[in-house]
Each structure stands twice: as structure tokens, then as C-alpha cells.
């Protein structure tokens, strides 16, 4: 999942709880901070900023797996700020999001190739990632994954434990082939899906370092390899 705050500021507090885990005790007012009676006077963005960064509900100085802090992880980047608080996007902002996503793209030095579909299958079902707080994911103890199956049906026989937030990916390779254009498209969707789906809820696996380029190649193989159970 995307390790930063959800694009929708109005839902920022809830997203922070879900994506980064609540750390510490419930929020309490600090010296000079508004009390709860003033919360209704704040905009959704002001309230989210106050509760996350000033009210003491999060240990914002706690170290994270990517080498920064919880506070840094909760800060929105330019793409997220562009998407935030808008139920509908005008063409200018859509173009801005696509441009930001396109500029973030990095490709393997040797070109885009398929990896090992069996490794991709394991990564697609692996929920180990970037949790912090009282239950920290220790990257030295276990490999991180992408948990694609949480949002997508990958194999027909695993439908009962597959998510439906995203489209079914059953027969992904059968329907698209393994040409260079297909491989490039699939890589880019995994690396930063906003380049094709502005303000999508799909995580930016590559640009945020959730999946390495090698791991992306394995998941691509799981989707595209004719021998993969995705394409049975």
C-alpha cells in the first residue's frame, strides 16, 4: 500500500489510521493548541494536520523502514495534494497528476523483462510491509510483498479470498500477450499507476519503494507468463 497519507484530505485522519497504524495514545491538546471545542471551526485539512502532527496522537519522530520518520511519511507530496479534497478533477489537475506520475518513472537499466512468476505469485499474496508502531515489520526478518490479491482476483481458484476493490486480473496475459508495449504498460501501472489512472487508490509500489524493480518484474511474470496460474 501507499506508505503516505491518502489523497483525500477530508478522509485524511481515517487513512492515516489505516495506512500507517495509530501510534501512541489518543490525541490530547498541547500548550497553545486549540481545544476540541474549536475543531468544528477548522477546515478538514487544518483538523487533519492538527490531529496528526500537533495533538500528540502519533509518535511522529519514530523511525520508519524507509529511513525517515512517521511524520515524514504522513506528509503529502505534490501528487497527493493535487488529488486531495476534490470529488471531481478538472482537466488541468488531471494533466498535472499525469505529468507528476510520468516524471517519477524509473526503468530497469537492462530494459523491462519478466521475472519468475512463482516469486510473483508469492509477492502478490504477501502482506508483510511497512507497519510501524507496536507491531513493526522487520525487513531483516522477512521479505516484503505487494498483497495484490487484497484488491484483485488473480486466479479463478482463489476467488473466494480475493479482493474486489480493483478489477479482476484473471487471464491478464492471455488477453494482452507479452509484447513490449504490454510489458511497458504493466510495469508503469505497478510503478506509478497515476500515469494512467489519475488519483487512483492503487498504491505507487515503485516510486514509494514498496516494491523493487526486481519484485515488479516477478509480479509482471505472474500476470503475463503463459505458464502462470493467472492465465490458466
Where are these regions (language model features)?
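Sec-dependent bacterial lipoprotein signal peptides
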Residues: 10-12
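Generic anion/oxyanion-binding catalytic loop in active/binding sites
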Residues: 18, 108-109, 137, 205-208
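Post-cleavage N-terminal segment of exported redox proteins
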Residues: 2-5, 14-16, 22-130, 222-232
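Disulfide-bonded cysteine motifs in exported proteins
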Residues: 78, 143-146
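Extracytoplasmic electron-transfer domains, predominantly the class I c-type cytochrome c fold
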Residues: 33-43, 47-48, 115-119, 132, ...
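Short coil/linker segments at helix-helix boundaries
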Residues: 102, 130-144
Amino acid at each position: 500500500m501507499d506508505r503516505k497519507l491518502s489523497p483525500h484530505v477530508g478522509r485524511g485522519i481515517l487513512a492515516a489510521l489505516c495506512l500507517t497504524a495509530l501510534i501512541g495514545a489518543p490525541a490530547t491538546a498541547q500548550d497553545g493548541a486549540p481545544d476540541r471545542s474549536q475543531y468544528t471551526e477548522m477546515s478538514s485539512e487544518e483538523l487533519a494536520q492538527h490531529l496528526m502532527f500537533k495533538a500528540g496522537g502519533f509518535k511522529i519522530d519514530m523511525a520508519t523502514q524507509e529511513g525517515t520518520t512517521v511524520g515524514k511519511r504522513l506528509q503529502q507530496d505534490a501528487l497527493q495534494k493535487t488529488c486531495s479534497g476534490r470529488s471531481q478533477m478538472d482537466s488541468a489537475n488531471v494533466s498535472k497528476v499525469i505529468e507528476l506520475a510520468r516524471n517519477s518513472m524509473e526503468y530497469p537499466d537492462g530494459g523491462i523483462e519478466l521475472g519468475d512468476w512463482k516469486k510473483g505469485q508469492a509477492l502478490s499474496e504477501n502482506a508483510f510491509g511497512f507497519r510501524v508502531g507496536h507491531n513493526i515489520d522487520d525487513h531483516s526478518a522477512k521479505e516484503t510483498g505487494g498483497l495484490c490479491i487484497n484488491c484483485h482476483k488473480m486466479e479463478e481458484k482463489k476467488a473466494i479470498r480475493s479482493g474486489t476493490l480493483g478489477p479482476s486480473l484473471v487471464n491478464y496475459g492471455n488477453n494482452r500477450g507479452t509484447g513490449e508495449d504490454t510489458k511497458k504498460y504493466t510495469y508503469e501501472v505497478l510503478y506509478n499507476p497515476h500515469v494512467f489512472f489519475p488519483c487512483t487508490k492503487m498504491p505507487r509500489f515503485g516510486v514509494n519503494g514498496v516494491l523493487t524493480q526486481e519484485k515488479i518484474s516477478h509480479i509482471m511474470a505472474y500476470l503475463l507468463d503463459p505458464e502462470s496460474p493467472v492465465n490458466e
